[in-house]
Amino acid sequence: MTAQTAPAFPHRHLLGIEGLSRPDIESLLERADAAVALSRQVEKKRTTLRGRTQINLFFEPSTRTQSSFELAGKRLGADVMNMSVASSSVKKGETLIDTAATLNAMRPDIIVVRHHAAGAVHLLARKVDCAVVNAGDGAHEHPTQALLDALTIRRNKGGIEGLTVAICGDVLHSRVARSNIILLQALGARVRVIGPSTLLPTGIERFGVEVFTNMREGLKGCDIVMMLRLQRERMNGSFVPSVKEYFRYYGLDGDKLALAKPDALVMHPGPMNRGVEIASDIADGAQSLIREQVEMGVAVRMAVLEALATHLPNG
């Protein structure tokens, strides 16, 4: 199925995985499959967004996500503007609502937003007339990361239904974990979360996941091991005794990975802290999908932008 024949995406914005149906998710993944094929050709451009303006508004630093959205927009023919918050009016005290009004006056077609506060992207979406994509809001959601993870798994395992996926590490501060839990369960996976009790959200069991504080126990029989970055910049107190101690119990090395299924695959949303949550030989090893995730990120973001373009005037 090509992107042109993929089922229509019914939403004007992509603010999170929560609220998407299974057909919505599968529609985006089908579009992304077509975008992978396009990205591997010599001529990589489409004209889907020709004449359209895309603003990337990042209130938090990002290298891979921002550059991935920029490349995705350009491959679809959009005029892409990266707004530097560090040198903008936001740093001078402008509120998010004022920023939204200012950007709206520029009449963009799509705004891609990353913000440190959960819910900020939803607020901005209510104040503008264009499509909005959530590129990560606080510890709330990161929908395109979950979509690219699902695409990577599907292309390597043939599907997601029935797989056991372990999400390991700093679940408490991770928007990636939240979006992946929702999406993977929607597609029929069994999800486990593994980490020290200090890095697991209170009441996470209500999401229908299995919870383990012993990593060796939690990895047994897993098809996918998804490691999370230890987000020390979001930690006000002492969540782990030391980096060395954390790696000993929760860092993925060969001994721990051997407890998963023999054909288990390893993922990480990046950026990685080598020697903290993952050993270098595992990150660079034959079971690692980490580099492929980066490629899938561009394809998924192309798919999302293309799907939202169908709701633009004359889209």
Curated annotation (Swiss-Prot):
GO terms for cellular component: cytosol. Its EC number is 2.1.3.2. One of its GO terms (molecular function) is amino acid binding. L-aspartate binds at residues 92, 175, 229. Pathway: Pyrimidine metabolism; UMP biosynthesis via de novo pathway; (S)-dihydroorotate from bicarbonate: step 2/3. GO terms for biological process: 'de novo' pyrimidine nucleobase biosynthetic process; 'de novo' UMP biosynthetic process; amino acid metabolic process. Keywords: Pyrimidine biosynthesis, Transferase. It catalyses: carbamoyl phosphate + L-aspartate = N-carbamoyl-L-aspartate + phosphate + H(+). InterPro entries: Asp/Orn_carbamoyltranf_P-bd, Asp/Orn_carbamoylTrfase, Asp/Orn_carbamoylTrfase_sf, Asp_carbamoyltransf, Asp_carbamoyltransf_Asp/Orn-bd. Carbamoyl phosphate binds at residues 64-65, 114, 142, 145, 270-271. It holds the Pfam family OTCace_N. Catalyzes the condensation of carbamoyl phosphate and aspartate to form carbamoyl aspartate and inorganic phosphate, the committed step in the de novo pyrimidine nucleotide biosynthesis pathway. Heterododecamer (2C3:3R2) of six catalytic PyrB chains organized as two trimers (C3), and six regulatory PyrI chains organized as three dimers (R2). PANTHER family: ASPARTATE CARBAMOYLTRANSFERASE, ORNITHINE CARBAMOYLTRANSFERASE, MITOCHONDRIAL. This is Aspartate carbamoyltransferase catalytic subunit. The gene is pyrB.
